[in-house]
Amino acid sequence: MAEMELWFTEQQTPDLGFTCKITKTIYTAKTQYQDLAILETKQFGRMLVLDGAVQTTIADEFCYHELISHVPLFTHPNPKKVAVIGGGDGGVIREILKHDEVEKAYLIEIDREVIEASKKYLPEISCALDDERAEVIITDGIKFVSENKNMFDVIIVDSTDPVGPAVGLFQDSFYKAVFECLKEDGLFVAQTESPFYDQDLIKNVFHAVKSIFPITRLYLGFIPTYPSGLWSFTLGSKKYDPLEVDVSRIKRIDTKYYNPELHKALFALPTFVQEIIK
């Protein structure tokens, strides 16, 4: 009799999916907000899945976490106070705390169970959550941002896809609240999905942010386990332009993806992406 194999498939569009071989189901739970699973995969190591969608894996998490963290943190000349909306796995906090000038990094996560599961089963990613410079606040990110004004140098929106609890993180009213939550020279970045499959979302978010922030930039990165592998990030800034960064500052931190040469290259957009945000 042939040995039975277990495969996981994420349906990324109605007509396309991402499939990988599973060697073990490590943990599953139905939280107050979503279905949570941690799977052991043959190709990518341990994988965090929320509501059937891959959030991160041990093998490729550095791509996403470095891109969403270091671009804004090197764009701001002195980011002392940083907030992460979402990102319960802790990967963004880990990258933020590589910057010595950061005095406090706040993780604003609605689902406590994501944090607890990540700390237990994904220690390589969540390792900085107990750092003395990190503070975890369990609350709704939209509520938190709307209740705090002129507070942060950088805000990073590390949200899940725009369904379920994350829907409000892609709306104009949220970006206005982010603007007010930032200090007078603050900036923010949000993950904004795939240019292949989410063109309307990227266009709408880019123009919403552009109507609020003096400087708005879109940049791209490669994340193998995300839909299409090509991923977009939208940055809104009150004062500092990521295209004017002194890239010599970038060499002083330890990274696997992000580097000085890559920083400005991230903002060189393919023609079809330029067309999306026209």
Swiss-Prot record:
Pathway: Amine and polyamine biosynthesis; spermidine biosynthesis; spermidine from putrescine: step 1/1. S-methyl-5'-thioadenosine binds at Q34, E109, D140, G141, P165. One of its GO terms (biological process) is spermidine biosynthetic process. InterPro entries: PABS (IPR030374), PABS_CS (IPR030373), SAM-dependent_MTases_sf (IPR029063), Spermi_synthase (IPR001045), Spermidine_synt_N (IPR035246), Spermidine_synt_N_sf (IPR037163). PROSITE patterns: PABS_1 (PS01330), PABS_2 (PS51006). It comes from the Bacteria. HAMAP family: Spermidine_synth. This is Polyamine aminopropyltransferase. It comes from Caldicellulosiruptor bescii (strain ATCC BAA-1888 / DSM 6725 / KCTC 15123 / Z-1320) (Anaerocellum thermophilum).
